[in-house]
């Protein structure tokens, strides 16, 4: 049992109120002006924000098969430090969770080592990136969160349509990395001014938007919840906006780096700036920000993609795609958008908590009496530099090295258990 004393909570209007919070038996038992500590532990939250634990539906934990990049343990330690209490792990592992047996093995490993809640995806196709569909029903029974071939797009419309019909029958979501392989052209960055300046092959916007346009029509026909991963282009935003207006059940996420950076920020041919989708144009970034504010884009997800140093500290042509994000998402977004008054604090918290929970019908993401005690304590005055040497993640691959941010998670509770406190994993 914990009593969080003298903290602040956001009310429904987005105003800060001074409150104490009682955690008992893994639940939020009481939120009140003052709670007397008669047993359990007192946690001093003076001057700090007590918020729901963050939810990230797009995380690469790499285990099994990629333990040199990340493990379930290190990835969930990173999540705890970043204030995340629920993360959803992508299936581009070896082996792929494409069968009941592999999924059950993965679930056992999660139960054994994870520091926060991990909800694993199953793949859409066997081995991921094929045209043979998995056994959707068996994988749902084994605990799959949803179905995705993230890392690659499902190339054949017929394969995707059949997958959507099967998912819809089970009331499960299809989550899509949208990329038409015939339109990538071997690109390593956005097909724009940086690619031209550096003489690099570029990935055009249409590689993403064409597949989203196809998929929203398939989702409409199948009656399926279709979720777009890491949306990155103005055309994609337009397609999703039109689909929502048409009543199609489509949701979308955007990553912090696509909101903060564009291709003009890339300093040179450095693999730590290589990600998929790539950093796009200024116009694309503006469309993402507009789409998030008008509800076209539903929430924020990190696409945390750790790699070993030797896979990133090379030119872009040789580097792996992806950057880490779990430990830096909140401070970056708070600094860039809340401190600058572009967003309210409530908007940011909602996009990291209740919005993803609502999209995927998760019973998390709220701080209220009776809710699961997934809680992050945030020091909105704390100022620190982003230093990969302090990361719990094995991946140190971030383009934000050295950036000064204000507003950091200082403690995280997962189902009432203190898992991170003042720089230390419990």
Curated annotation (Swiss-Prot):
Q: Kindly give the Gene3D superfamilies that the UniProt entry links to this protein.
A: Metal-dependent hydrolases, Urease, subunit C, domain 1
- Report the EC code(s) recorded for this entry: 3.5.2.3
Provide the residue positions that the database annotates as binding Zn(2+) 1: 58, 60, 150, 303
GO process terms (BP): 'de novo' UMP biosynthetic process; purine nucleobase catabolic process
Any single GO molecular-function term of the entry would be: dihydroorotase activity
Q: Where does Zn(2+) 2 bind?
A: 150, 177, 230
Q: What detail does the entry give on cofactor binding?
A: Binds 2 Zn(2+) ions per subunit.
Q: Which residues form the active site?
A: 303
**Cross-referenced InterPro entries, in alphabetical order?**
Amidohydro-rel (IPR006680), DHOase (IPR004722), DHOase/Allantoinase_Hydrolase (IPR050138), Dihydroorotase_CS (IPR002195), Metal-dep_hydrolase_composite (IPR011059), Metal_Hydrolase (IPR032466)
* SUPFAM superfamilies in the cross-refs: Composite domain of metallo-dependent hydrolases (SSF51338), Metallo-dependent hydrolases (SSF51556)
- Record-annotated disulphide pairs: none
Give the UniProt keywords, A-Z.
Hydrolase, Metal-binding, Pyrimidine biosynthesis, Zinc
Primary enzyme class: hydrolase
Q: Where does substrate bind?
A: 60-62, 92, 276, 307, 321-322
Task: Report the cofactors.
Answer: Zn(2+)
Q: What are its GO cellular component terms?
A: cytoplasm
Reactions that this protein is recorded to catalyse: (S)-dihydroorotate + H2O = N-carbamoyl-L-aspartate + H(+)
- Which pathway, per its entry? Pyrimidine metabolism; UMP biosynthesis via de novo pathway; (S)-dihydroorotate from bicarbonate: step 3/3
* Function description: Catalyzes the reversible cyclization of carbamoyl aspartate to dihydroorotate.
Belongs to which family? Belongs to the metallo-dependent hydrolases superfamily. DHOase family. Class I DHOase subfamily.
Protein name, per record: Dihydroorotase
Q: Which organism is it from?
A: Listeria monocytogenes serotype 4b (strain CLIP80459)
């Amino acid at each position: 049992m914990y009593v969080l004393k003298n903290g602040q909570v956001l009310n429904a209007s987005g105003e800060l109120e001074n409150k104490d919070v009682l955690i008992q038996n893994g639940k939020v038992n009481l939120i009140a002006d003052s709670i007397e500590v008669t047993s359990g532990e007192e946690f001093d939250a003076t001057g700090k924000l007590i918020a729901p634990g963050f939810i990230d539906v797009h995380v690469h934990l790499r285990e099994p098969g990629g333990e040199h990049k990340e493990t379930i343990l290190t990835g969930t330690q990173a999540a705890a430090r970043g204030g995340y209490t629920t993360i959803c792990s992508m299936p581009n592992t070896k082996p792929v969770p494409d069968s009941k047996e592999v999924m059950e093995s993965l679930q056992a490993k999660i139960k054994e080592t994870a520091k926060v809640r991990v909800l694993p995806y199953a793949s859409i196709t066997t081995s991921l990136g094929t045209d043979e569909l998995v056994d959707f029903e068996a994988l749902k029974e084994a605990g799959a969160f949803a179905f995705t071939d993230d890392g690659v797009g499902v190339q054949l419309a017929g394969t995707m349509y059949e997958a959507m019909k099967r998912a819809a029958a089970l009331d499960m979501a299809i989550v899509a990395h949208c990329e038409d392989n015939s339109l990538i052209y071997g690109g390593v960055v956005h097909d724009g001014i940086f690619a031209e300046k550096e003489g690099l092959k570029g990935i055009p916007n249409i590689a993403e938007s064409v597949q989203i346009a196809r998929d929203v029509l398939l989702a409409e026909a199948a009656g399926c919840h279709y979720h777009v991963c890491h949306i990155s282009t103005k055309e994609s935003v337009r397609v999703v906006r039109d689909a929502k207006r048409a009543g199609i059940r489509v949701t979308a996420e955007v990553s912090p780096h696509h909101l903060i950076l564009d291709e003009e920020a890339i300093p040179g041919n450095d693999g730590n700036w290589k990600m998929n989708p790539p950093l796009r144009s200024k116009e694309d970034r503006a469309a993402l920000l507009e789409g998030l504010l008008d509800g076209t884009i539903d929430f924020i997800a990190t696409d945390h993609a750790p790699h070993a140093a030797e896979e990133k500290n090379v030119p872009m042509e040789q580097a792996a795609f992806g950057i880490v994000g779990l430990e830096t998402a909140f401070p970056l977004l708070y600094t860039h958008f809340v401190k600058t008054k572009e967003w309210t604090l409530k908007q940011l918290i909602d996009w990291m908590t209740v919005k993803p929970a609502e999209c995927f019908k998760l019973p998390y993401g709220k701080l209220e009496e009776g809710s699961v005690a997934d809680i992050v304590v945030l020091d909105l005055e704390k100022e620190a530099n982003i230093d990969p040497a302090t990361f719990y993640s094995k991946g140190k691959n971030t383009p934000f090295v050295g950036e000064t941010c204000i507003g950091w998670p200082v403690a995280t509770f997962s189902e009432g258990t203190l898992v991170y406190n003042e720089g230390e994993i419990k």
